[in-house]
Design a protein with these regions (language model features):
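Short coil/turn linkers that connect adjacent helices within long alpha-helical scaffolds
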Residues: 1, 16-22, 40, 56-64
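Alpha-helical solenoid scaffolds in eukaryotic proteins
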Residues: 11-12, 52
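Conserved tryptophan-centered aromatic signature that marks the ligand-binding surface of SH3
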Residues: 43
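C-terminal non-catalytic interaction modules
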Residues: 47-83
Length: 83
């Protein structure tokens, strides 16, 4: 599956999770979008998605997701500054 199609599916998953107030799904979708956008070199947008994932994980008490989002946020932010 190509990256654009995958991004479309993840964005739809985010919409559905939001409509259903499924916070764990929202944070997971933001993480996936961040990873996809990092791979495309869109570090500015990916850091925003990682930040959203981190905040939602913090709200829901999901420590593992919060830590993963922090790491990805830091890596994308560093990559953005290097380019």
């Amino acid at each position: 599956m190509n990256q654009d199609k995958l991004q479309m599916f993840v964005e739809r998953y985010l919409e559905l999770s939001s409509e259903l107030h499924y916070k764990k799904g929202e944070s997971g979708a933001f993480m996936q979008l961040g990873e996809l956008l990092t791979n495309k070199g869109d570090y500015d947008t990916s850091t925003k998605h990682f930040y959203r994932a981190m905040k939602i994980a913090e709200e829901t008490g999901d420590g593992d997701m919060k830590e993963a989002a922090k790491v990805n946020f830091g890596m994308a932010n560093a990559s953005m500054k290097m380019n």
